[in-house]
A protein has these predicted regions:
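A shared catalytic/ligand-binding motif for oxyanion handling
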Residues: 1-209
Length: 209
């Protein structure tokens, strides 16, 4: 099984749509979690009905800048447990009966709302009874080296993120490739790049996968 998570920052853009189709064609994910789609269900269906996923949950955000899409193929036995504008939680059952939990997570982007993200993550843990992996854009980073900017890292926010992962028994899964997943696209000294997207999982999940 392959999992794909992408903050697409608006799927109404034709270039983004082409990029999504290309990624899906090349990576062949079984489950796909998209954030900041900026589309409701009708808009998503009109533009992306030909994507190779037979099942979907589309969550429209009251703010036009948000929105989630959680897509999966029939080949995976997946049951959605609950969802909000910031997450989708599902239970996956493998062919051998092994059960694990998958969360697509989108953290609140504003600094004053970070605590909402961590409360939500702790709340979701209460539904999990076994192996658990969380993928998405947490809108937070775990260490100072994950931010490249003229501005100082927010060490209190780093510590809060670490604490909630420890509390939920989740560990970072690491990455391969370019170290930053977001940029403010400003020139020169005003440019900021941060590693905001990641996967985290508990030991029960990493022991299996």
């Amino acid at each position: 099984m392959r999992l794909l998570s992408w903050n697409c920052q608006g799927l109404g853009n034709p270039w983004t749509g082409r990029s999504l189709r290309k990624i899906v064609r090349e990576q062949v994910p079984t489950v796909c979690f998209l954030m900041e789609t900026r589309l409701d269900k009708n808009g998503f269906d009109n533009l992306y009905e030909n994507l190779p996923f037979q099942n979907k949950i589309i969550v429209k955000h009251p703010d036009s800048g948000g929105g989630l899409a959680f897509l999966w193929k029939n080949e995976v036995r997946l049951e959605v447990i609950n969802f909000t504008v910031n997450h989708v939680l599902a239970k996956v059952t493998e062919e051998d009966g092994f059960v694990w939990f998958l969360t697509g997570f989108y953290g609140w982007p504003k600094a004053q709302q970070k605590e909402k993200s961590w409360r939500l993550l702790k709340y979701l843990q209460s539904f999990v009874g076994g192996p658990w992996v969380v993928i998405g854009d947490f809108n937070a980073y775990l260490q100072a080296s994950e931010k490249k900017s003229a501005r100082q890292p927010q060490f209190a926010q780093i510590e809060a993120f670490r604490e909630v992962l420890n509390s939920c028994h989740l560990q970072d899964l690491g990455y391969i490739g370019y170290p930053y997943t977001w940029s403010n696209k400003r020139p020169g000294a005003a440019n900021t790049k941060i590693h905001l997207d990641r996967g985290v999982a508990n030991k029960e999940w990493t022991d299996r996968f």
